[in-house]
């Protein structure tokens, strides 16, 4: 097999989607301007609002928030800076998952052949941000399906809701910052399809 040279863009995507993430639950966040500050175990996290989340989170103190954090920038600074990913904490105690959905991954293996794998994908939040969904799904594809070992070309993830609405993540670029604050109802996800 020939070794493909990966573009810088693909290497950057691989680096970003392999970053550690933090899933902070049930915190209060303080909004000033377009930044919400969370303190968790003496660690400060500043989250920028870049999209529709600007209209949802009020100035001052906000209770019962979860935040999905991926550090932006590559500095070694002590502060965590992240974008979007804020959702309301689950209203109901769920023993395990909020729901399991079918994750279908199609991967071209030759000129006219495609391998398809189907797995259960667990959703743990009633309200889930596109940031978290996108990040964890790509992480799964990196770990299980060699995403970013080669150029992603026009690979996509498509999340379909029970009402027929859908959300698309293009795998050849990072999720746009203004979408990182978009939130959907995790209970209403019908299925997730990936074309690699």
From Swiss-Prot:
Record's subcellular location: Secreted
Chain spans, region Sialyl Lewis X-binding: 65-167
Subunit structure: Homodimer (via its C-terminal domain). Interacts with host FCAR and SELPLG (via sialyl Lewis X).
Organism superkingdom: Bacteria
InterPro entries in alphabetical order: Enterotoxin, SSL_OB, Staph/Strept_toxin_CS, Staph_exotoxin, SuperAg_toxin_C, Superantigen_bac, Toxin_b-grasp_Staph/Strep
Keywords in alphabetical order: Secreted, Virulence
Cross-referenced Gene3D superfamilies: 2.40.50.110, 3.10.20.120
Gene (UniProt): sl11
Free-text comment about domains: The C-terminal domain contains a V-shape binding site for sialyl Lewis X.
Family: Belongs to the staphylococcal/streptococcal toxin family.
GO cellular component entries: extracellular region
Name listed for the protein in its UniProt record: Superantigen-like protein 11
């Amino acid at each position: 097999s020939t070794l493909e040279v990966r573009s810088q863009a693909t290497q950057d995507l691989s680096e970003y989607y392999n970053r550690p993430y933090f899933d902070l639950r049930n915190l209060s966040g303080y909004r000033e301007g377009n930044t919400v500050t969370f303190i968790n175990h003496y660690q400060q996290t500043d989250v920028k609002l870049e999209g529709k989340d600007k209209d949802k989170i009020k100035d001052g103190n906000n209770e019962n928030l979860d935040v999905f954090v991926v550090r932006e920038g590559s500095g070694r600074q002590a502060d965590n800076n992240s974008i979007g990913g804020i959702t309301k904490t689950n209203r109901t105690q769920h023993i395990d998952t909020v729901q399991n959905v079918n994750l279908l991954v199609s991967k071209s293996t030759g000129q006219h052949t495609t391998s398809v794998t189907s797995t259960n994908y667990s959703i743990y939040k009633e309200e889930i941000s596109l940031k978290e969904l996108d990040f964890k799904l790509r992480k799964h594809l990196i770990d299980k399906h060699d995403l970013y070992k080669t150029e992603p070309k026009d690979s996509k993830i498509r999340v379909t809701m029970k009402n027929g609405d859908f959300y698309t993540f293009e795998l050849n670029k990072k999720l746009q910052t203004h979408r990182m604050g978009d939130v959907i109802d995790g209970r209403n996800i019908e299925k997730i399809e990936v074309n690699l």
